[in-house]
Amino acid sequence: MNSFVSTVLLLSVTIALVSGYPSQLQTTCVTKAKSCTMFFLNGVYCTECTYSGTLELKIGSTCTFSIYEKKVASQPNENSQNEVAQCKQSSCYSNQFVPVDCAAAFGNEYITYIENQ
């Protein structure tokens, strides 16, 4: 009976250790930048800032690369993309990007990180 209890205890510890081990390695690399230009328009002092960021996400053998860009102008015109983020994504091994939803590509945590500069 003692060996049965020891065997059950050993198996449960082994199962607990194995189940806690990640099955696929995940790595994340995030960059962010902010650039602003200042100009005079119709006698008004204006600024336009661009918030940009990248996210490289590797899960196992799958790798995606996403680009985030958002322009914010103090005097928006009718052609501007003011306050509308534009995102695109590709495989890490390709340079052919497709437009994607920013929330899906980056998630709220990384969008907040990029925009808080």
UniProtKB/Swiss-Prot annotation:
Source species, domain of life: Eukaryota
InterPro entries given in the database record: DUF1505
Subcellular localization: Secreted
Gene Ontology CC terms, in alphabetical order: extracellular region
Signal sequence annotation: 1-20
Keywords on record: Secreted, Signal
Pfam family for this entry, one: DUF1505
Family: Belongs to the UPF0375 family.
Protein's UniProt name: UPF0375 protein C08F11.12
Organism of origin: Caenorhabditis elegans
